[in-house]
Amino acid sequence: MLIDEIVSKCDKRYSNLADCQCEDCPCETECSHDCKECLENVHFPDRTTIRREYDCVNMADCYYCKYSYRYASELIYGLRQFRDIKNRDILKVMSVGCGPCTELAAIDYMLSKGEIHYNKLEFVGIDPLKNVWGNIWDDIKDYLADDDRIFGQRYSGYY
């Protein structure tokens, strides 16, 4: 499945960084070499004096490993509520602030379980942070490259 493949690639990149993990880290103070801590600073800014945003590829890989299964499961629960998407000729999905495109992982899971069917999938993801999520987008494109049901993939920029 897509999610397992992307988690594996993100984990491999994140695990292989060792000492250079924070090479591109914009932390103003000494870095803890722990992207989970930086993610906490992003998600709970009131708990810290260090202002962080999604601004590091290492953090993006850590994020996908830590949160993708949880977020994909929430998307699956939500998508199951909409009967009209279960059998579509063209399934059109737009994600604003798509980040690592976890919607595609949820759709891939539902497709593999026979919960939805489509002949074509048009996915448009809008997110200005290509420099942060780009490795994951490339991994997704590689995974989906042989699937002729996918078209119209866009993951970056302002459309």
Question: What are the roles of these predicted feature ranges?
Answer:
Residues M1-P45:
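N-terminal auxiliary segments of SAM/dcSAM-dependent transferases
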Residues E122-D127:
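Conserved SAM-binding motif I beta-strand of class I
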Residues D89-G99:
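Conserved class I S-adenosyl-L-methionine
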Residues F82-R83, L111-E115, I140, L144:
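Active-site catalytic pocket residues across diverse enzymes, especially alpha/beta-hydrolases
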Residues P100-H117:
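Conserved SAM-binding loop of SAM-dependent methyltransferases across substrates and taxa
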Residues T48-I85:
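Class I SAM-dependent methyltransferase Rossmann-like catalytic core
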Residues W133-Y159:
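S-adenosyl-L-methionine
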